[in-house]
Structures are given as C-alpha cells and as structure tokens.
UniProtKB/Swiss-Prot annotation:
Gene: GOT1
Lineage: superkingdom: Eukaryota
Sorted UniProt keywords: Amino-acid biosynthesis, Aminotransferase, Cytoplasm, Phosphoprotein, Pyridoxal phosphate, Transferase
Entry protein name: Aspartate aminotransferase, cytoplasmic
UniProt cross-references to Pfam families, sorted A to Z: Aminotran_1_2
Protein family per UniProt: Belongs to the class-I pyridoxal-phosphate-dependent aminotransferase family.
Modified residues (N6-(pyridoxal phosphate)lysine): 259
Organism placement in taxonomy: Eukaryota, Metazoa, Chordata, Craniata, Vertebrata
The species this protein was found in: Pan troglodytes
Molecular function in Gene Ontology: L-aspartate:2-oxoglutarate aminotransferase activity; L-cysteine transaminase activity; pyridoxal phosphate binding
E.C. code: 2.6.1.1, 2.6.1.3
One biological process term in Gene Ontology: aspartate biosynthetic process
Amino acid sequence: MAPPSVFAEVPQAQPVLVFKLTADFREDPDPRKVNLGVGAYRTDDCHPWVLPVVKKVEQKIANDNSLNHEYLPILGLAEFRSCASRLALGDDSPALKEKRVGGVQSLGGTGALRIGADFLARWYNGTNNKNTPVYVSSPTWENHNAVFSAAGFKDIRSYRYWDAEKRGLDLQGFLNDLENAPEFSIVVLHACAHNPTGIDPTPEQWKQIASVMKHRFLFPFFDSAYQGFASGNLERDAWAIRYFVSEGFEFFCAQSFSKNFGLYNERVGNLTVVGKEPESILQVLSQMEKIVRITWSNPPAQGARIVASTLSNPELFEEWTGNVKTMADRILSMRSELRARLEALKTPGTWNHITDQIGMFSFTGLNPKQVEYLVNEKHIYLLPSGRINVSGLTTKNLDYVATSIHEAVTKIQ
C-alpha cells in the first residue's frame, strides 16, 4: 500500500484577511455592496486608476528598441535606486552629498522590509542579533510583525500609538515606551499616512520622538508607502525622514511605489540605507547583495524603469506629481464629505478624527460588532478594526455608507 501524501499533515492556514474581504465582496450579488477594505486607490467610479503618466512612460519603454530582457544587477536598476533614495531624502540631502546613502531595489515595500530585517538579524550592531527587541506601533500594518518574525527576531514589542478614547495619537505613551526601550532596539516608524490609523505626528512631535530615540540609541526603520499620496505634497510627506537625516541618525527606509505610481502588481520598492560614512554603506550593500541573491536573486525591470524614467525627467516628474495630487485631493474630499454627512445625521460621537487623519485609510472608531453589522446587513466590507479605505467612497455611495454607519452606531453599542 502506498504511503499517505507527504503533505497530509499540513494544516490549513487562515486566509489573509484583507484579500479574503475582497474575495467575499466580489462574490456578493447585492447591488448596494461597497468595498472599503481593499488597500488600493479607486476612482469615483470605483475602478483602479492607471496614472496617465504611467501609460505614457509604458508606451515610451515599449518603443525603445535599445531595451532588452537581460538580468538586472542583483541590487537592481542603478538609476531607479538612485532616484528612489533621492525622492525620500531630497535633492539637497547632506547624506546624499556625502555619499553615505545606498539603495536596494526590492519586491515592493514588503520586500524592502524583509531584506532590511534579514540584514539586521545578521549584522546589526554586531552579529546574530535575533534577540534585539523590535518595536512596532499599536496598532500597525499586520505584515510588520510577520516580516520581522520570519527574519528570526524573537522579541517583537509594541509601542503605544493610537488613543482610542480621543481617537488620536497617544504621544506621551509613545514617548514613554521609547524611553523605556532597551538601548539599540529597532523601531519601525510609519513615515507618513500611518496604516491603519491615518494619524501622523506633527513636526514638533517628530522632534520629540527623534530626541528620545537619539539618547536611547534606538535604530529607526521607516516604512514609507505613501509619499505624496498622504498630503499631495512630496516634501511634506518626507519631513520626518529628512529630519532624522539632519539629526545624524543612521537608518533604513523601506519605500513602496505601489500607491503613488499605482503600480501594485509590478512590485516596485526600494530599501534606502543611510549610514555615517561611505565605507560602511559599501559594506552593508555587499552583505545585502548576498541576501538578495538567495531571496529573489535579482528584481524585475518593468516597474523600476517606469519609476526611474518618470523621476529623472522634469516634465514627466511634474505630470506625475499632478497625478498624485489628483488621488490625494479626491481622498481629502471624501473624508470631508463623510464627516459632513455623519454630523448632519447627528450620528452619536465625534467625527472630526476622519478629517484629522491623513492618507488612504481612516480608523473610524467603529467596534467589531458594528463592523459585523455593516458587512452582514449592509454589504459594506471593512476590516474588523474599523479601518476603511477612504478611496472606496464615491459620490454615488457616500450617502448609503454614511446612513449605514449611522444605523450601526445607533443600533449597536
């Protein structure tokens, strides 16, 4: 008799929640259905948007007979890496001028986080540092915990961030947790448009955060998934990163071009490394090359070419910033409209946090039972945490969503 399958004992894993939500939405025949769970931009017609500048650059690339499908270098397309790091740090960055910046092209922001985490587990502040505490915000994007765990870190902790009572930033809790963190701990920071809360520190608050991190010798690992997409202004959205450079920090910054270029399925990311001197950057990149080689060997070219072509051409860059502002402005408009409708309905509670928050997501303050009501009774799909994708709102579904939220809050405590 043949033995059972070698896979017979493999347990069924739980589905990834945000993707399951979208699958459930697609299967729902109800005409009123609204998807506020998806982590991607939508137009006012609820469609994905291919940026006009991306279409233009794709055509340009298709017509360029000098291009081929040869392997890229292990660390990626040099022009892309340079342009991406410059976008985060700014043209006048002292770190760039002093040649103490390196970049690694990655498979999206997640790939940048993973390569950075793998490197830190092996080489940060010595060797084999898997017992170094890694701090993530409470709450945070769920993949942060998973990526650092998969890299081998054994001590992942949270720092206070969201104050549910006031629906805003718990700055004092945040600072206290940093103050009490062991020296040389790694701290994951959202550069802008915090996911899932949409609440960002002000520049003055960032200065306080940097001050504590500096005297505790904490290592910043920025996650920058929304530059330009949060406020519509590239410089404003990179303020924290650039301030940390000015304060002399060494740090990593995982960049994603999924949102601000709409290149979700091209997996375009970059890990920017800022060090103290050029020599250390060369050493870091030499080790990252080894890690990339056994992870994805080398990255795909198409998305990187699109981003590099756009960022390096002044005319295309200007068009791109206009496209980004179009997306950011629509989201800001939907925030205002949702808040206005909830206040007009006299929905219990305060709703100013919707417009105080920034970026694609809003932490509504709805509890899991209210979310369950919206999903099951109203066919409005959102995460159990109450996080919504504001770009899932449109001029056509706003009234329905607002009255449904009003019902959920009024009926269910």
